[in-house]
Amino acid sequence: MKLIVAITGATGAPLAVRLLEALKHIPNVETHLVMSRWAKTTIEHETEYSARDVAVLADVCHNASDQAATISSGSFKTDGMIIIPCSMKTLAGIRTGYAEGLIGRAADVVMKENRKLVLVPREMPLSTVHLENMLALAQKGVAMVPPMPAWYNHPKSVTDIENHIVTRVLDQFDLDSPFAKRWQGIHAK
């Protein structure tokens, strides 16, 4: 399986790091990473990682301005793309087909090739414009996986919450997360 992972500058960089760490533990998954300019800043602000540290978690790292990268073409076969976190600017660009930079172009390619596109939108509160953009994309088959915590699994830390969100993202590709804590029913503890 080949997956594109894109990181935008929206808050939530630890989720992207955790996703890449999870994908490292899943056999036969090749990751292609793209980080926006602001993603690099956000990574260094929100985590203990540098952008370089995050880049080495991926199999291939592409420059966000390289419109000639392999992932900018539909003839380069991938199984889909995850944008985590996804800024509202990026989401709006995807909705309108404005393929600025490699993240927008790769998302456009994934959509036109009818491959799986998963967005982890990061904003609060949501405006009607945000909601309309998300609805329009969802109606086109794009999966919206907002990073919402679950309380049924009794998280003890922020890492537990991140693990749950990453598990739900990986579920979109039918990949088993090494961090999964699955619902076992109300009486199971």
Predicted features by range, described:
Residues 1-118, 124-189:
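A cross-family phosphate/adenosyl-ligand binding-site feature
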